[in-house]
From Swiss-Prot:
Name of the molecule in the record: Glucose-6-phosphate isomerase
Pfam annotation, one family: GPI
Record InterPro entries: G6P_isomerase_archaea/bacteria, G6P_isomerase_prok, GPI/OXD, RmlC-like_jellyroll, RmlC_Cupin_sf
Subcellular location: Cytoplasm
Organism the protein comes from: Thermococcus onnurineus (strain NA1)
Amino acid sequence: MEYKAPIGVKIDLETGVIPGAKKLVRRLSDLKGYFIDEEAYNELLREDPVVYEVYAIEQEEKDGDLNFATTVLYPGKVGKEFFFTKGHYHAKADRAEIYYAIKGKGGMLLQTPEGNAKWVPMEPGTVVYVPPYWAHRTVNTGDEPFIFLAIYPADAGHDYGSIKEKGFSKLVIEEGGEVKVVDNPKWKA
């Protein structure tokens, strides 16, 4: 039997960078149609800020292996809505995932395909278990980068299309200086 070699990498806990990892940058323009306030989106789009960066160590897409990645989700808002990641289901929907908060403040918005949603606040040291079949999106509710580690099956894949089409049933907004989770008026069941 031929064995895969183990690897070890050091994550920069201040910046979230994993040296040598595959880097993905998502700008506001990559999130067209995701935010509820289109006017605020179009205004901020002139600057087209970086919303988040992902540093991934990926394996071959096969059963039994694991990928891991850090995400650096920058602070900001579009209208009242905090910056967030696109969010996704897994292409192999029966795959779970683990998130570990490293730095900053935020949370995870999760939902079933029927739109039953759960909000889990996150701060450094928080671990979130994402069960199979749940969509998930992270949200930065603070004023500094929100950095977290994700560990997931290498064959899980990402289904971004379902979220692009239907959205999440809830929005995470700032209202009166507080973080609130409210119904999304554009949610499509």
